[in-house]
Amino acid sequence: MSKRDFYEVLGVPKNASDEEIKKAYRKLAMKHHPDRNQGDAAKPAEEKFKEAKEAYEMLSDPQKRAAYDQFGHAGVDPNMRGPGGAGAEGFGGFAEAFGDIFGDMFGGRRGAGGGRQVYRGNDLSYAMDITLEEAAKGKEAQIRIPSWENCETCHGSGAKPGTSAKTCTTCSGTGTVQMRQGFFSVQQTCPHCRGTGKIIPEPCVTCHGQGKVKKQKTLEVKIPAGIDDGMRIRSVGNGEPGTNGGPPGDLYIEIRLKKHEIFERDGDDLHCQVPVSFITAALGGEIEVPTLQGKAAIDIPEGTQAGKQFRLRGKGIKGVRASYPGDLYCHIVVETPVKLTEHQRKLLRELDDSLKKGGGKHSPSGESWTDRLKNLFT
């Protein structure tokens, strides 16, 4: 049976870049991996896996690819080459293409020279409540977060004073063990030492063998002006410590805006309810409204109705990524007077009688409302 074209196997054109070839191989290898195909699908998947591996090994090597492009399969056939020809390479190509994938999948990477696996520390989160004014202007704050320091009892070794850690006999100090499944070999974290390569027979009673103790430290945090609810600030390296010399995680500070007694935020805009007496709404006049920058004046036109919206440009918040501030929207709430005296009631009745004599012209919706009622009941 003749071999398929290597480019056809990977599904890439002949002028594909090295990165395109690598991505195509990754996709096929994950799809046809023996662990993902069981039963009747196992054998065909294994063949396709081997085929993709062979194609990648040839096309990922510049010299082999050049020979293949010029002579086809004959150019890379070991039976057609001298002693210096390509021989079996095991899983070299697979490890090269998938080393970073499996490193991320299991949370660890091999140290330099194939040593113990190192693990990045976990990220930490911290919720910070701030006021709307603080969000608008920005602020500097101090927060208390967990920190891990070397244990003073064992000086960071994790072992009881007078004793020492021993090399793990399961993994011979490498921190990893090899697991074979058919022809495929997988490297896993040693379950005995959990990737450290060391076993502590007598743990330190202070740190329980961890070598570090948890304490608290104060961190200075700068909150940028314009930050909004739900945004996060990243503090690099202030998360949990790594394992086996791995880098620490990061700290994420999540901002939570406190409810404001006057304003509601909508992106960079602000909204507020402005109460107005029905006299001012009817006759018009100037009123004062609050803003984050102080007081501002609004001219209320005669006959203003409840729900009328007034826009004050630039009186909102300048967001973190914004070039200019948002606006303030003032929503008019016409107040109905309460606890009236008898004299005040009499005056209002007289006003009501006078308005009724004018028909619907004194009410912006009076005539249309009356017409709709007539149509409904006729």
Swiss-Prot record:
GO cellular-component terms in the record? cytoplasm
> Where found in the cell?
Cytoplasm
Which InterPro entries does this chain map to?
Answer: DnaJ, DnaJ_C, DnaJ_domain, DnaJ_domain_CS, HSP40/DnaJ_pept-bd, HSP_DnaJ_Cys-rich_dom, HSP_DnaJ_Cys-rich_dom_sf, J_dom_sf
Its primary localisation, in coarse terms, equals cytoplasm
Task: Report domain J positions.
Answer: 5-72
Molecular functions per Gene Ontology: ATP binding; heat shock protein binding; unfolded protein binding; zinc ion binding
Cofactors named for this entry: Zn(2+)
Could you list this entry's UniProt keywords, alphabetically sorted. Chaperone, Cytoplasm, DNA replication, Metal-binding, Repeat, Stress response, Zinc, Zinc-finger
Which sections of the protein are CXXCXGXG motif repeats?
A: 151-158, 168-175, 190-197, 204-211
Annotated Zn(2+) 2 binding sites: C168, C171, C190, C193
PROSITE patterns in the record, alphabetically? Answer: DNAJ_1, DNAJ_2, ZF_CR
Biased composition, class Basic and acidic residues, residue ranges = 369-378
Query: What is an annotated GO biological process for this record, any one?
Result: response to heat
Specify which residues bind Zn(2+) 1 according to the UniProt entry for this protein: C151, C154, C204, C207
Give start-end positions of each zinc finger (CR-type).
138-216
Under CDD domains, the record lists: DnaJ, DnaJ_C, DnaJ_zf
Pfam families for the chain = DnaJ (PF00226), DnaJ_C (PF01556), DnaJ_CXXCXGXG (PF00684)
Locate the region Disordered: 354-378
Q: How is the cofactor bound?
A: Binds 2 Zn(2+) ions per monomer.
Assembly and interaction partners: Homodimer.
Q: What does this protein do?
A: Participates actively in the response to hyperosmotic and heat shock by preventing the aggregation of stress-denatured proteins and by disaggregating proteins, also in an autonomous, DnaK-independent fashion. Unfolded proteins bind initially to DnaJ; upon interaction with the DnaJ-bound protein, DnaK hydrolyzes its bound ATP, resulting in the formation of a stable complex. GrpE releases ADP from DnaK; ATP binding to DnaK triggers the release of the substrate protein, thus completing the reaction cycle.
Family to which the UniProt record says this protein belongs: Belongs to the DnaJ family.
Q: What is known of its domains?
A: The J domain is necessary and sufficient to stimulate DnaK ATPase activity. Zinc center 1 plays an important role in the autonomous, DnaK-independent chaperone activity of DnaJ. Zinc center 2 is essential for interaction with DnaK and for DnaJ activity.
Would you tell me the protein name for this molecule?
A: Chaperone protein DnaJ
Q: Organism, per UniProt?
A: Paracidovorax citrulli (strain AAC00-1)
What phylogenetic lineage does the species belong to?
Bacteria, Pseudomonadati, Pseudomonadota, Betaproteobacteria, Burkholderiales
Q: Which gene encodes it?
A: dnaJ
